């Protein structure tokens, strides 16, 4: 992208409100995350319910990896028991350990993954970038619908989507005392400011709790 002089800006006389960099709180507690590992409630197609839960838990366990990156994972992304992948949103290389529970999820789909770790894309069907993009968009929508339904049935107030797993990963680490720089590295953020936006709402929540003890 090139740079333009201020004089070239056609809307210079208009005042535009500053973009709000705060992010909606989308994390859930560790106890709520665990509910997704224990439930086996029937909702629609069992195949997609199981896949939705597994993707949600896998993301939480593997550094909050997002849905698009999960969909594109292949066996080549596993290096010496660690997950190595380029985050599509930032182009940053992420290297993170794969917990045993996450490895078990991967193994579950070995026979039906069609060239990928998860049965979302198929190397024989989704060949162009547009085909992959459309497929990912479609399955992500289906997965999120199932997660929302599951969340309600489990009595979780938050609106559950795949992105909640990413925020929850950051939240649980923060509350466990993990350094923000390490959390930022795991999330693949380009700077600490982005990570701080993620974590500010959690800090506010803790302040609210602390203020209840003022009197």
Regions found by a protein language model. Name each.
Residues 76-82, 157-158, 178-197:
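Short, polar N-cap/turn motifs at the start of nucleic acid-interacting alpha helices
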Residues 27, 87-91, 123, 187-212:
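Catalytic-site neighborhood detector that most strongly recognizes the C-terminal catalytic loop/helix
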Residues 33-34, 99-157:
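Active-site/catalytic core of tyrosine-dependent DNA strand-transfer enzymes
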Residues 16-50:
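Long, amphipathic, Lys/Arg-enriched alpha-helical "connector/arm" segment
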Residues 95-100, 104, 108-109, 200-215:
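DNA/chromatin major-groove-contacting recognition/catalytic segments
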Residues 1-10:
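N-terminal DNA-binding recognition helix of tyrosine site-specific recombinases/integrases
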Residues 38-47, 111, 144-185:
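Short, basic (Lys/Arg/His-rich) helix/loop patches that form interaction surfaces
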Residues 13, 62, 72-108, 123:
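Conserved tyrosine-mediated DNA breakage-rejoining catalytic core shared by Y-recombinases
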């Amino acid at each position: 992208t090139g740079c333009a002089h201020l004089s070239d800006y056609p809307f210079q006389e208009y005042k535009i409100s500053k973009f709000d960099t705060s992010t909606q709180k989308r994390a859930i507690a560790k106890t709520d995350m665990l509910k997704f590992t224990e439930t086996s409630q029937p909702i629609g197609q069992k195949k997609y319910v199981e896949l939705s839960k597994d993707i949600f838990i896998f993301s939480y366990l593997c550094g909050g990896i997002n849905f698009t990156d999960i969909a594109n994972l292949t066996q080549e992304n596993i290096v010496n028991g660690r997950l190595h992948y380029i985050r599509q949103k930032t182009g940053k290389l992420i290297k993170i350990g794969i917990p045993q529970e996450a490895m078990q999820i991967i193994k579950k789909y070995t026979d039906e993954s069609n060239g990928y770790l998860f049965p979302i894309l198929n190397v024989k069907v989704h060949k162009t970038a547009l085909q992959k993009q459309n497929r990912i968009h479609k399955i992500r929508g289906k997965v999120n619908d199932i997660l929302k339904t599951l969340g309600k049935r489990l009595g979780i107030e938050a609106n559950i989507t795949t992105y909640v797993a990413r925020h929850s990963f950051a939240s649980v680490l923060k509350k466990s005392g993990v350094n923000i720089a390490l959390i930022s590295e795991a999330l693949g953020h380009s700077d600490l400011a982005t990570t701080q936006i993620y974590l500010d709402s959690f800090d506010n929540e803790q302040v609210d709790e602390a203020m209840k003890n003022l009197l």
